[in-house]
């Protein structure tokens, strides 16, 4: 009876929705500090809560490095409260009709569309990417929400009647319980939207930890989810760094962890979370190669290389950071440089900007050091963006488009993921040599080949050991009816993000063997031998 009453309350809550987010954000508050810098709240039990923490992290505008907010490192008590809220909400949410959960997401995707530009503005302010790119960030996440609305078919089980006389076998998918997500700074909307909508539509409750550098988009997305009718406690949000990550990895009530970020963090979370008996999926670093054949459409290929290498200032796990020029295609290098020179570097909210700043001064320093390593190890810098100055934003973390040629696979700038607006260029004589270079690299997130020859494209797609391959498509991120299938050192776990695999990750199978005898008779004696069923 209690479960029925709780489920009825959930359904009533789902029907009480508003159509617009409030104009004044409820997830920011007036600062408790002496300055006027706002502080970011936690989201626990359906309420935006001011943290009692004495540890705070500054949020900077990467274009100016001014402090625009502060985010708390949640206390142990606050993190425990968030988990307790998830745990309390789970039974009623799991018992809620899948159609009702679907209705929440149908309303949610509409509210995201209506507030897309507001979310994008927050992303540009905190992360630095251009407004157009920020809108793309939100839109690609929205596509996953839209796909999650297909849950009624995606969660279907399997049935086999009459496996033997009067006996049927069937299986269905059930939610795991409390799941958690740890998101990176580079996609403040898309990556969280890969996580909690898929988990929640399956009947799980969710604990989200956005990047402490870019919390604003996730907080607005939480408000929109609440306005869509999601019951209190089904989504909770904490903030923090190492202590919050360890808390998520160790807490016994968390059943699964989704992570996107660096290799160092991903390996750590995968090992620690797995050690504590959790499912873990971890998307990590990359070194994505674009192989250019001499028969490719030159103008189209050059534009695609430049856009995929330098868009978002190279801060994408699917950035095309390495070009492999095959045969006569090496003659295109001067034109490649000219195309890159035409890109406009500016603050993300400025009209006409093609790429914005890097996320922090430390990120800029690391990128510049990797460029330096190329010159020290014998590479040539054809285009150098290290000394770029953006008028009016002299304190920003800007690096302009940079192209390094004569790169060899043993060089540091090739071996490490740069995560900046830097394209390293290698040259080979044959396609087979290019394939060998790609396959010898430990990463397996994405790759692309540019050619007008179908046989060449097919050979490359079949022989290259990379999880996602583009043919004349520089950033082959699958649409959400498929799954994001990075591989090798770019991924840890056995089930990928979104698509069918996303549903599998957030659910568990239950199989029922049922017998109703036609004669409705009782056994005359106990059956003590192993049932063979098929005889």
Curated annotation (Swiss-Prot):
Transit peptide location on this chain: 1-33
Disease: Methylmalonate semialdehyde dehydrogenase deficiency: A metabolic disorder characterized by elevated beta-alanine, 3-hydroxypropionic acid, and both isomers of 3-amino and 3-hydroxyisobutyric acids in urine organic acids.
EC assignment: 1.2.1.27
Protein's recorded name: Methylmalonate-semialdehyde/malonate-semialdehyde dehydrogenase [acylating], mitochondrial
Subcellular location: Mitochondrion
Effect of residue 172 to H: In MMSDHD; uncertain significance
Phosphoserine: residues bearing it: 262, 380
Annotated Gene3D superfamilies: Aldehyde Dehydrogenase, Chain A, domain 1, Aldehyde Dehydrogenase, Chain A, domain 2
Chain positions with N6-acetyllysine modification: 47, 52, 55, 76, 87, 117, 129, 298, 330-331, 364, 376, 500
Task performed by this protein: Malonate and methylmalonate semialdehyde dehydrogenase involved in the catabolism of valine, thymine, and compounds catabolized by way of beta-alanine, including uracil and cytidine.
Annotated binding of NAD(+), by residue: 183, 185, 209, 212-213, 262, 417
Active site: 317
UniProtKB keywords: Acetylation, Disease variant, Mitochondrion, NAD, Oxidoreductase, Phosphoprotein, Transit peptide
Keyword Transit peptide belongs to the record: yes
Record note on quaternary structure: Homotetramer.
BP GO annotations: branched-chain amino acid catabolic process; brown fat cell differentiation; thymine catabolic process; thymine metabolic process; valine catabolic process; valine metabolic process
UniProt entry tagged with the keyword Phosphoprotein: yes
Reaction it catalyzes: 3-oxopropanoate + NAD(+) + CoA + H2O = hydrogencarbonate + acetyl-CoA + NADH + H(+); 2-methyl-3-oxopropanoate + NAD(+) + CoA + H2O = propanoyl-CoA + hydrogencarbonate + NADH + H(+); (R)-2-methyl-3-oxopropanoate + NAD(+) + CoA + H2O = propanoyl-CoA + hydrogencarbonate + NADH + H(+); (S)-2-methyl-3-oxopropanoate + NAD(+) + CoA + H2O = propanoyl-CoA + hydrogencarbonate + NADH + H(+)
Gene name in the database record: ALDH6A1
GO molecular function, one term: methylmalonate-semialdehyde dehydrogenase (acylating, NAD) activity
UniProt GO cellular component terms: mitochondrial matrix; mitochondrion; nucleoplasm
Pfam family, one: Aldedh
Modified residues (N6-succinyllysine): 47, 52, 55, 76, 117, 129, 364, 376, 391, 517
């Amino acid at each position: 009876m209690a479960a029925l009453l709780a489920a009825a309350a959930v359904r009533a809550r789902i029907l009480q929705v508003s159509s617009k987010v409030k104009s004044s954000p409820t997830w920011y508050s007036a600062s408790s500090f002496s300055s006027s810098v706002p502080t970011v709240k936690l989201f626990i039990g359906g309420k935006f809560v001011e943290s009692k923490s004495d540890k705070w992290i500054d949020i900077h505008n990467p274009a100016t490095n001014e402090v625009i907010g502060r985010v708390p490192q949640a206390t142990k008590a606050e993190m425990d409260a968030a988990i307790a809220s998830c745990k309390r909400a789970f039974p009623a949410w799991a018992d809620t009709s899948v159609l009702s959960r679907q209705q929440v997401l149908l309303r949610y995707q509409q509210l995201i569309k209506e507030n897309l530009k507001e979310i994008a503005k927050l992303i540009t302010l905190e992360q630095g990417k251009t407004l157009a790119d920020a809108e793309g960030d939100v839109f690609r996440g929205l596509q996953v929400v839209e796909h999650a609305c297909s849950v009624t078919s995606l969660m279907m089980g399997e049935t086999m009647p009459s496996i033997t006389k009067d006996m049927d076998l069937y299986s269905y998918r059930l939610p795991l319980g409390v799941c958690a997500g740890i998101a990176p700074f580079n996609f403040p909307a898309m990556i969280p939207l890969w996580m909690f909508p898929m988990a929640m539509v399956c009947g799980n409750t969710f604990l989200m930890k956005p990047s402490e550098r870019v919390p604003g988009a996730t907080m607005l997305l939480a408000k929109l989810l609440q306005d869509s009718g999601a019951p209190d406690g089904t989504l909770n949000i904490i903030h923090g760094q190492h202590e919050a990550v360890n808390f998520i990895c160790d807490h016994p009530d968390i059943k699964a962890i989704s992570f996107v970020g660096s290799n160092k963090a991903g390996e750590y979370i995968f090992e620690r979370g797995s050690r504590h008996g959790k499912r873990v999926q971890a998307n990590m670093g990359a070194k994505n190669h674009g192989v250019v054949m001499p028969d490719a459409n030159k103008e189209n290929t050059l534009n695609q290389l430049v856009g995929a290498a330098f868009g978002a200032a190279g801060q994408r796990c699917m950035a095309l950071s390495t070009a492999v020029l095959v045969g006569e295609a090496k003659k295109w290098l001067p034109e490649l440089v000219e195309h890159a020179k035409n890109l406009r570097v500016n603050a993300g909210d400025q009209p006409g900007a093609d790429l914005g700043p890097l996320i922090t001064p430390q990120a800029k320093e690391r990128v510049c050091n990797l460029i330096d390593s190329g010159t020290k190890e014998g590479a040539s810098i054809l285009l150098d963006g290290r000394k770029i100055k953006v008028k009016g934003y002299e304190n920003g973390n800007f690096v302009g488009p940079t192209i390094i040629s004569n790169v060899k696979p043993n060089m540091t700038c090739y071996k490490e993921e740069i995560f900046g607006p830097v394209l390293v260029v290698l040259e080979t004589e044959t396609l087979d040599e290019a394939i060998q270079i790609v396959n010898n690299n430990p990463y397996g997130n994405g790759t692309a080949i540019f050619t007008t020859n179908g046989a060449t494209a097919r050979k490359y797609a079949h022989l290259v050991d990379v999880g996602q391959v583009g043919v004349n498509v520089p950033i082959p991120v699958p649409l959400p009816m498929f799954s994001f299938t990075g591989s090798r050192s770019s991924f840890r776990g056995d089930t990928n993000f979104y698509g069918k695999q996303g549903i599998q990750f957030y659910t568990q199978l239950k199989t029922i063997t049922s017998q109703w005898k036609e004669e409705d008779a009782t056994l005359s004696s106990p059956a003590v031998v192993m049932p063979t069923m098929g005889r």
